[in-house]
Amino acid sequence: MAPQRSQDKTPIQLLHEYGIKISSAPKYELIHADGDAHQPSFMFSVTIGEVTCKGRGSTKKAAKHEAAEAALKLLKRDSQIIDQRDNNGLSPEAGEASNPVGILQELAMQRVWCLPEYVVFMETGPGHMKEFTIACRLEGLEETGSGSSKKLARRAAAENMIAKLQSLSGSSEITWSPPSRVYVESLRNSTGEKVSLLKRTPLSLPNTDYIQMLLEISLELGFQVTYIDIDELTVNGQYQCLVELSTRPVTVCHGSGVTSSNAHNAAAHNALQYIKMVASKH
């Protein structure tokens, strides 16, 4: 089956949705870039399944659109068109607006999520050829988008976030839900077995696997644990990292050690000390 070309979706969006349905995501590749600074020209190829098409444009996004458009035409010619007016799981009005930023905002409000946050991630190029990269953050997810203006970059980031949500949902209808929210204050009232054990356990015992201990507590309470390695060594030449707990507010603790693994264990130890302190308060 081939994707329906509806007026409220871009060729890139339609091809992405079709890729989800056939379990083969479109892959874009920059073939070459030429021209001068005032008239650049880019050529991209897109491959989906056994189909490969090319597109040319004055921007990378335009070239990708042309490639996706060519792939859609080829798929349409070879297959019967299936109507896809699902509007990303939102109301018809939201889909028809073709405004990714507005669609994402409405989705967050409907699901009672935190509203999307947009942060300028990078700014490159001379004054007349600026390119902005903006990160869109939503419920623990992050996607970036680029454009010749902040508005276009923000739109691209929102578009990519919607595509990410569709991918996590396994279809063009967004059914994904963020992990349950665990508020730091709620730790005081926890009666879980692992938390109760933590309250009674000294955190100064040698050769303790604090990483495993933190994992068990996170599974009991329902928050996620993410370790972030820091490239720079400490002044003493030790590895260092951060551990982030998806609590509300987010909890971040630092750790360092003679190896990366030791740094992770130290960060987990510090996070456990914090959890123990909060859980023991009355």
Swiss-Prot record:
GO MF, one example: siRNA binding
Sorted UniProt keywords: Cytoplasm, Repeat, RNA-binding, RNA-mediated gene silencing
GO biological process: regulation of regulatory ncRNA processing; siRNA processing
GO cellular component, one term: cytoplasm
Complexes and interactors: Homodimer. Interacts with dicer1 and eif2ak2/pkr. Also able to interact with dsRNA.
Protein family according to the UniProt entry: Belongs to the PRKRA family.
Protein name: Interferon-inducible double-stranded RNA-dependent protein kinase activator A homolog
Task performed by this protein: Activates eif2ak2/pkr in the absence of double-stranded RNA (dsRNA), leading to phosphorylation of eif2s1/efi2-alpha and inhibition of translation and induction of apoptosis. Required for siRNA production by dicer1 and for subsequent siRNA-mediated post-transcriptional gene silencing. Does not seem to be required for processing of pre-miRNA to miRNA by dicer1.
Natural source organism: Danio rerio (Zebrafish)
Localization annotation: Cytoplasm, Perinuclear region
Family annotation (Gene3D superfamilies): 3.30.160.20
Pfam families the record matches: dsrm (PF00035), Staufen_C (PF16482)
Alphabetical list of InterPro entries matching this protein: dsRBD_dom, Ig-like_dom, RLC_Component, Staufen_C
